[in-house]
Amino acid sequence: MGFRVLVLVVMATTFALPFTFFEEPGRSPFRPALRSEEAQALRHGLTLLLARRADGQPPDMRQPEMRRPEMRRPEVRQPEFAELSVGQRRWDVDQCMYYCLTGVVGYSYTECETMCT
């Protein structure tokens, strides 16, 4: 019962609003208008998306320059095991893991373990 009353109140309120509330017919003053170039870009993007879906391709519409650059893994030179003592090897692996895990790139533990061992 309460939901029906709420719906009726909302319908009556929106019907009772004067048409001068809107700046232009069909356009709300609270929603910013799209500029013509933005509207054209939006239409173009939607056209590309629909074309890709029709072709069965993934819907990645971003331009190549807007895509996130691929992160390259830093090359970690592993010294020969004969060169280092057991304690030195363990320290180097631990240091490699520390720098890998706390670095800017944000590798997972498994990725760091693969690179450092």
From Swiss-Prot:
Q: Does the keyword Secreted apply?
A: yes
Q: Which UniProt keywords apply?
A: Cleavage on pair of basic residues, Disulfide bond, Ion channel impairing toxin, Neurotoxin, Potassium channel impairing toxin, Secreted, Signal, Toxin
User: What Gene Ontology molecular-function terms does this entry list?
Assistant: potassium channel regulator activity; toxin activity
Composition skew (Basic and acidic residues), residue ranges: 62-77
Record GO cellular component, one term = extracellular region
User: Residues annotated as region Disordered?
Assistant: 53-77
What residue stretch is flagged as signal peptide? Answer: 1-22
The entry's localization annotation reads: Secreted
Q: Which domain of life is it from?
A: Eukaryota
Q: Which residues form the propeptide?
A: 23-90
* Membrane-crossing residue ranges in chain numbering: none
Q: List the disulfide bonds.
A: C96-C116, C100-C112
What does the record say about tissue specificity? Expressed by the venom duct.
Q: Which family does it belong to?
A: Belongs to the conotoxin R superfamily.
The record's note on its domains? The cysteine framework is XIV (C-C-C-C).
* Full protein name: Conotoxin vil14.2
| Organism the protein comes from | Conus villepinii (Villepin's cone)
